[in-house]
């Protein structure tokens, strides 16, 4: 890529990056883990092995495999290995089985922790753009005494989640506000790769609506594409250099770049304001600080691709 380059960094992970994984793993004992290891050894299938290193990833794989092969033992974690059928939206459908995404559940709680907050009993939390519940199902297992909600405009995903993930309040929301929630209802709202798809108009509209439903000093945690994502797609997904250059120039000039990328019929959605977008922190600072305070900005924190932000409602 020609032109000016920015130094693109990724945020280092630490013990704070695995809070949810450690909470769920701590519900197991040595006998539970030995039972799983014995079963996997008897199966002699190289697809189903627990890595020795690093230990945090070993814990995640233990939870995933255990909830699938020994649910009668591992159900004490609160996780379930139920997965949507292939015709239902699920961003983990590349896996043969799963129990939700521990990675993104950890990411959300790490962002809260780094912002000086924790999940509290009896408080309400919303997964905005939950799809079939891949993140919120894990957080519900880790923090069962809190109130968990999920909303998404993809009808089939929400219907599946309602039927298969009890204890979480799912709602099939519209692509335009308002949401069916009260003012100041939530202590925290999180949105994984939702503000990576809005047009600029829709992005601002939804920031205002989410601000309405968050309590004063409550948090919005979200991931979105930034400059780091352009480099990621260029290096890993074969995004043409000319497209990257054009998007990068627009992004550096205006702080926001939107691209139409989806074909008609994409999960029945209205695509007029739904594509791919890239946002710089300068745009966040220039457009949102009347209603929000920026607490955290992590470059490339989500899968070495998307940036993670934490905003506090004023």
PLM feature segments, named:
Residues 179-189:
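A short acidic, Gly/Pro-enriched loop at the edge of an enzyme's catalytic core
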Residues 127:
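Class I SAM-dependent methyltransferase core
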Residues 5-6:
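Basic polycationic patches enriched in arginine
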Residues 124, 147, 185-187:
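Structural signature of beta-strand start/N-cap positions in the alpha/beta core
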Residues 204-216:
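A short glycine-rich, Lys/Arg-flanked "PGG" loop and its adjoining helix->strand segment in the class I
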Residues 187-201:
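A short SAM/SAH-binding and catalytic strip from SAM-dependent methyltransferases
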Residues 11-121, 131-178, 200-205, 221-314:
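Class I (Rossmann-like) S-adenosyl-L-methionine-dependent methyltransferase catalytic domain
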């Amino acid at each position: 890529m020609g032109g000016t380059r920015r130094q693109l960094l990724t945020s280092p992970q630490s013990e704070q990056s695995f809070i949810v994984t450690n909470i769920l793993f701590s519900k197991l004992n040595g006998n539970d883990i030995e039972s799983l290891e014995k079963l996997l050894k008897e199966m002699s299938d190289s697809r189903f092995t627990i890595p020795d290193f690093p230990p945090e990833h070993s814990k995640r794989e233990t939870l995933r495999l255990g909830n699938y092969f020994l649910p009668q033992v591992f159900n004490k974690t609160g996780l379930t290995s139920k997965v949507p059928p292939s015709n239902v939206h699920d961003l983990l459908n590349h896996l043969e089985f799963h129990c939700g995404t521990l990675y993104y559940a950890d990411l959300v709680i790490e962002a809260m922790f780094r912002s000086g907050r924790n999940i509290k009993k009896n408080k309400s939390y919303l997964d905005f753009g939950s799809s079939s519940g891949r993140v919120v199902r894990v957080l519900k297992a880790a923090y069962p005494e809190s109130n968990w909600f999920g909303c998404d405009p993809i009808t089939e995903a929400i219907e599946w989640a309602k039927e298969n993930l009890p204890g979480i309040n799912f709602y099939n929301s519209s692509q335009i506000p308002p949401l069916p929630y009260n003012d100041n209802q939530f202590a925290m709202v999180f949105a994984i790769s939702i503000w990576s798809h809005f047009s600029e108009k829709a992005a601002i509209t939804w920031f205002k609506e989410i601000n309405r439903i968050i309590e004063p000093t409550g948090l919005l945690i979200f991931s979105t594409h930034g400059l780091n994502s352009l480099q990621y797609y260029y290096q890993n997904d074969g995004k043409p250099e000319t497209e990257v250059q054009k998007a990068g120039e627009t992004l550096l000039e205006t702080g926001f770049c939107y691209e139409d990328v989806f074909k008609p019929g994409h999960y029945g959605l209205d695509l007029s304001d739904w594509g791919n977008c890239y946002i710089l922190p300068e745009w966040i600072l220039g457009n949102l600080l009347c209603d929000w305070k920026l607490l955290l900005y992590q470059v490339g924190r989500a899968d070495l691709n998307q940036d993670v932000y934490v905003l506090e409602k004023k």
